Amino acid sequence: MARGKTDGSRKTRHAQRSGHGPAVVLFLAGALLFCWPWLSGAVTIPWDAKAHFYPQLAFLARALHEGQSPFWTPNVFGGHPQIADPQSLIFSPPHVLLALFDRAPSFVAFDALVFAMLVMGGLALMALFRDRGWRAEGALVAALAFAFGCSAAWRVQHVGQVVSLSWFAVALWLLMRAIDWRDRPRAWVWGAAAGLVAGLMLLGRDQVAWLGAIALAILGAGRALEACAAGGAWRGTLRALVKPLGAGSLVGALVIALPFAFTLALAAQSNRAAITFEGAAGGSLHPAALLTFVSANFFGTDGPLKDYWGPPSSMVWGETGLALARNMANVYLGALPLVALLCLGALRGGLLAREMRAFTCAALFMLLYALGRYTPFFALAFHLPGADLFRRPADATFLLGALFAVMAGYCVHRLFADDQRASGRRMAMEAGVVALAFLACVVTAFDKGRLQQAAPMLAASCAWLAVSLAFLWLAPRWRGRALAPLAGIGLLLAFDLRANNGPNESTALPPELYEALRPDARDPVIDALRERLAQSQGPDRRDRVELAAIDFHWPNASLVHGFDHWLGYNPLRLKWYADATGAIDHVAVADQRRFSPLFARYNSPMADLMGLRWIVTGPPAGDLDSRLAPGDLRLVARTPAAHIYENPRAFPRVLLVGRARKADFDSMIATGRWPQVDLRETVLLEDAPETMRARAPGSARIAAYRNTQVDVNVEAPEGGWLVLNDVWHPWWRAEVDGKPARLLRANVVFRAVELPAGAKSVTFRFAPFAGLAAQILGRAP
């Protein structure tokens, strides 16, 4: 009798484990179907993917292949500490590998890497299903919905968050394996692997990574409690978990320690050391956005922007106070997963099954968090450590989609494993629930006067829902037909996601739009800048450029081409630089070109000091600077996209001056008042002596200029001050004739070093590790 039961259970486990190989093949085929427009080069991932993340990769690759350090870049914001910036990709292993093997990564290679990470995450979930003995049909649903549903598809341009999400899936699989295999001799290896991958996830240092850590904690605790309850021996189970979980915690902590220290140090120096509750609440997900679970293009998300009527469109919804792009409000996971969650999960109890309770709790957490100010929960969650570092609770939809994908897959597993054939009464109830969800869309469209506009999308969604519901009713009848259910799921869900979450204005645009970002670009503006920068180069010069109000993707083009841009595109900027110059996170349109009291116009000491020689603007410069006077700038070229101006007053990058004067930099930033001195002969310092005779004139020339080291040859018969018009940062060090010298903050935001008589050489070197240690110990300047 016992042997018969054992044989039966083995057959059940074998049946549940069978089909995973074909499921993987179907998943990869579905992935190819979905990704082909990008992989073929017909379209490319636009917006932040190209405007921000691709230039970061291009800079990383260029630096590595030139034998330079990528830890600092002079190409944006007057200089920026890449090693501490979460979005620099320096601590993203797949991007580092691509940069090592390809000096100039193509758009296709960059996009392929993004999708490869999502495919990796999908495969990890399939491995999780196989480990747990869940059926391949459910694994296929989970993998497809995870990789190409919800925010993974609609926000694929947010590359860092997509990478964090992908690592989350792998970490989840390894964590569950470490807990399940706790009694095996090498369980600690799996725990260490889980910690390593969780650490890689957290290296993203974005909100998805932070929420992913919370989700892993909830799911890990749930699985551990489940194991304790199943075994009955709580103490023994908990003792067995110490090694794998301890190993994971140790490895994870080692992985993240140094990068986290750098980023926290940069945050303290930045324009956004913390986010206020009000600032974060503006990134809440509007409750109406949940209707896109039912109908992907319900609000016209993938059409022209003028036709979009979903939140936070003020013309339709009134003033919401939200700051979200339209694609951030789309959470479509596929009709089949939605029907599975509603019918098999909610009505048939799948979501409350023992294996799913932790997933349900984690999903509820993410849903409430994403809704932000629309529920009281976010006010409580905002007190969690780290919550005030992020500004958009709607980012939780990344994790919500991943959790829903697993939950939907589990519900499909139960459908086949338990042969859950629906009675007529149950079918009527399930059809009613799906109809109610669909009716909510219809009523909303009618209420907002958009029913006619939404009708085509609603009709398509109705068809996908009906087919998916019918499939789940009929599929259990095909249990004995080998691969028929798998093939049906693969075809239905893959084509659904391709049709509804496929290329659109938010996720796919022609690559020709981004020609200026190619390392070998043949763009008129890039060509003109290359020519003029070469012509104006001198022994003491390294002229800066401004790329303002040309287009969304232009501000970080300097990272690709090696231009020194005093602006850029990055939400994280050095506070003293942003305050002094007015630089904000972007300069894609005219009203983002902000002037500050200290940099009040193009004809200003700040513009001249930074060596701003070439100014490129989309509209005429006078549209950006209302105080521009004739002769302030000289128009030197016009292209179809831009005007190119020369500032003839731009200073060289290095100057040797003979006089110093004390100045209150905070007061200067606030009032915009410059002392009445000749800045070619005098340097402003915060702690200069009250009286100082002028030194005899000298000279300076740049001997070598690299990302993290600048060598300058000087002739200083009576000494003086060498001014380097690069942004000051406490992690830079200076040497004069090979001996350490004090690096001074000069002229509000730049660098200087005092020279003794007869000095011959000065070296400025970026020393982030020593600088970080000094900052932690309270010894930073």
Summary of predicted features, one role per range:
Residues 30-125, 144-169, 279-335, 370-380, ...:
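Membrane-interface coil-to-helix junctions
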Residues 141-153, 193-201, 395:
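Short aromatic/hydrophobic helix-turn
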Residues 125-148, 185-188, 425-426:
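Transmembrane-helix signature of polytopic, membrane-embedded enzymes
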Residues 148, 152, 199-208, 253-255, ...:
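Transmembrane helix irregularities
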Residues 53, 556, 567, 636, ...:
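Active-site-proximal, structured, solvent-exposed surfaces of multi-pass membrane proteins
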Residues 3, 10-84, 108, 261-271, ...:
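Hydrophobic alpha-helical membrane-insertion signals
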Residues 486-610, 639, 644-692, 729, ...:
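Extracytoplasmic/lumenal acceptor-recognition loop(s) of multi-pass membrane glycoenzymes
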Residues 158-166, 174-197, 208-209, 213-241, ...:
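Contiguous transmembrane helix-bundle modules in multi-pass membrane proteins
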